[in-house]
């Protein structure tokens, strides 16, 4: 039954790429559940996913990052899907890569029920990553997705992608990030979660960080839609994902749109994060 969901994600990708091109970064006057102004592409991508997933009987319900609550499709269905239809959509206006994220939960939403994840990257080409037993990369060519390779992270990487407002970082966090650059880590940060994490996965390792800061103590990235799906992917690829001290996949949410500080990366970098944050 998961295969039907994966195939539907593949079908949605070129249509969403199309609406990205058509929207040209145009905004509506509306805001989503967490106060972000919505692009036309956000809402059109959301509509595509909702319409296509409604055709799959095994999907019990959907929760979009663009909406406050859940949409129940089939009460007898097996899977709940949380998704961000267009992550990093503010980058559309400047023609940078953006993405779509899916978390597939069995029964009800919750880290312990997450059984598969996927994301799509819309850039010069379209790429898809699906994580279930392993993490598989697909490239869209000649009207279809072709399997490219299985992704696996090295023990230690070379990329540093530091998010959140730097002026609001804890001094110890800033000291840690600066130490990575002093060791020769390369800055690779676009402001889009999907392309930045995709870069680390493709290049074989590194660190993406979005800590709690004085302007957002609980972080900015949403657990169900962004943090948990990517935590699943990174762990399946041989890496790790924590909130500073605890595995993201051990966290519990109280609201559909809860946020969390998060760090994704190779084992070496995540252990260093843990050692820094144990002292805070």
UniProtKB/Swiss-Prot annotation:
Mg(2+) 1 binds at residues 65, 84, 86. Pathway: Carbohydrate biosynthesis; gluconeogenesis. Binds 2 magnesium ions per subunit. GO terms for molecular function: fructose 1,6-bisphosphate 1-phosphatase activity; magnesium ion binding. Its main location: cytoplasm. Substrate binds at residues 87-90, 189, 220. It comes from the Bacteria. Transmembrane segments: none annotated. It catalyses: beta-D-fructose 1,6-bisphosphate + H2O = beta-D-fructose 6-phosphate + phosphate. Its cofactor is Mg(2+). GO terms for biological process: fructose 1,6-bisphosphate metabolic process; fructose 6-phosphate metabolic process; fructose metabolic process; gluconeogenesis; sucrose biosynthetic process. One of its GO terms (cellular component) is cytosol. The keyword Magnesium applies. Belongs to the FBPase class 1 family. NCBIfam families: PRK09293.2-5 (NF006784). Homotetramer. This is Fructose-1,6-bisphosphatase class 1. It comes from Wolinella succinogenes (strain ATCC 29543 / DSM 1740 / CCUG 13145 / JCM 31913 / LMG 7466 / NCTC 11488 / FDC 602W). The lineage of its organism: Bacteria, Pseudomonadati, Campylobacterota, Epsilonproteobacteria, Campylobacterales.
């Amino acid at each position: 039954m998961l295969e039907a969901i994966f195939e539907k994600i593949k079908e949605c990708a070129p249509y969403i790429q199309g609406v990205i091109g058509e929207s040209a970064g145009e905004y509506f006057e509306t805001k989503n559940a967490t106060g972000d102004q919505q692009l036309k592409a956000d809402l059109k991508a959301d509509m595509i996913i909702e319409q296509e997933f409604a055709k799959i009987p095994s999907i019990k319900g959907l929760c979009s990052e663009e909406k406050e609550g859940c949409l129940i499709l089939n009460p007898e269905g097996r899977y709940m899907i949380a998704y961000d239809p267009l992550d990093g959509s503010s980058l559309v206006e400047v023609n940078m890569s953006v993405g779509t994220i899916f978390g597939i939960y069995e029964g009800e939403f919750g880290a312990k029920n997450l059984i598969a994840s996927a994301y799509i990257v819309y850039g010069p080409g379209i790429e898809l990553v699906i994580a279930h037993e392993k993490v598989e990369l697909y490239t869209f060519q000649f009207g279809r997705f072709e399997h490219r390779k299985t992704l696996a992270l090295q023990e230690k990487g070379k990329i540093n992608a530091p998010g959140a407002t730097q002026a609001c970082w804890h001094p110890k966090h800033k000291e840690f990030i600066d130490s990575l650059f002093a060791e020769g880590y390369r800055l690779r940060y676009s402001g889009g979660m999907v392309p930045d994490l995709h870069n680390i996965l493709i290049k074989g390792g590194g660190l993406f960080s979005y800590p709690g800061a004085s302007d957002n103590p609980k972080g900015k990235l949403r657990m169900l839609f962004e943090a948990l799906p990517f935590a699943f992917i990174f762990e399946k690829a041989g890496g790790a994902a924590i909130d500073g001290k605890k595995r993201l996949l051990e966290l519990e949410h109280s609201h559909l749109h809860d946020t969390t500080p998060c760090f994704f990366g190779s084992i070496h970098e995540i252990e260093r994060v843990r050692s820094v944050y144990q002292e805070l």
